[in-house]
């Protein structure tokens, strides 16, 4: 970063005069990779980035085999729309991350997320997981007195390892605060 992917999003931000938050697979060095969120300002410049700190190892989520935990800390990114506390996916389950961003001055927390149901989850488990996800996000908003933007992936992804059939991402992006 910067690179070919950031050039594309930079152009989109500038052409549409919008601030964009996107997640990228960052190759920092040979064997050193991060799940990184990059924030683009309206003029297309890179306002900042955040490297995911909490790396999951759950059925069909095998990130620990690919990603290294982030090393940039919990620092809000100044943009023309405010101070954005950008965290990535699994970071949402840790209240300390949201709190540290809020204490550092974040006005909005943004979570680019890819969460859904694993193929063997029962209907009861699906409801439990979905309710927990929404409750945690709302809790961050209430506890820290700011808005939370939870943006979640949609669609199905096969688990090529064969351990499960895959994940059905549930979408349901929302704003709370």
Features from the language model and the residues they span:
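A short, polar/charged loop-to-alpha-helix boundary motif
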Residues: 52-66
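A generic fold-level signal
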Residues: 32, 69-71, 143, 168
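Short beta-strand-to-loop element that shapes/binds the nucleotide-sugar donor at the catalytic cleft/hinge
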Residues: 22-27
């Amino acid at each position: 970063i910067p690179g070919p992917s950031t050039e594309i999003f930079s152009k989109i931000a500038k052409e549409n005069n919008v601030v964009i938050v996107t997640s990228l697979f960052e190759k920092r060095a040979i064997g050193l990779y991060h799940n990184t969120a990059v924030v683009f300002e309206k003029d297309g410049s890179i306002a900042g980035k955040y490297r995911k700190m909490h790396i999951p190892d759950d059925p069909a989520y095998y990130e620990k085999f690919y990603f290294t935990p982030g090393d940039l800390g919990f620092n809000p990114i100044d943009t023309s729309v405010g101070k954005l506390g950008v965290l990535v996916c699994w970071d949402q389950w840790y209240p300390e991350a949201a709190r540290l961003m809020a204490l550092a001055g974040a006005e909005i927390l943004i979570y680019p997320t890819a969460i859904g149901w694993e193929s063997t989850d029962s209907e009861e488990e699906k409801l439990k997981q979905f309710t927990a996800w929404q409750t945690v996000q709302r809790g961050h908003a209430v506890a820290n007195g700011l808005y939370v933007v939870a943006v979640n992936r949609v669609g199905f992804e096969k688990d090529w390892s064969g351990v499960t059939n895959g994940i059905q991402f549930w979408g349901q992006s929302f704003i709370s605060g």
